[in-house]
Amino acid sequence: MAALGQKTVLVIEDDPWTRTITTALLAGEGFAVVEAKNGEEGLKQARAQAPDAILLDLALPTKSGLDVLRELKGETSTQDIPVIVVSAYGTLMNESDAHCAVGVIQKPFDYDDLVGQVEHATARSLEVALT
């Protein structure tokens, strides 16, 4: 549960080590972090938690990150949540998918880039909520 005024980030990442490190980094910067280890769990958490931003790994088992992104952007309850996609394989998105994400981070990611993009995405979430 996020404290009043605290931004919530949903981290959808199948690799336990990467998920743990990412969660620790974001929590250390003052974000409330919700974790999901696969696409289905991530979709459930996004619907239930309505996070301020989502950090989404593209290479997920069973349901790909691109499928998750498309579902998130296709549902009224989640379409305005800013999504930052993460990939170890460079750009795996085509142009039609790229416009759905507010940022792209390549693994291994730079700490400052990760935090900066999440801060930007959560600020964007607030702007959308106020309009």
Feature map (PLM): residue ranges:
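Two-component/phosphorelay signaling modules centered on CheY-like receiver
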Residues: 16-34
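The feature encodes the CheY-like receiver
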Residues: 61, 79
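Conserved acidic carboxylate
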Residues: 13
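C-terminal output helix
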Residues: 109-122, 126
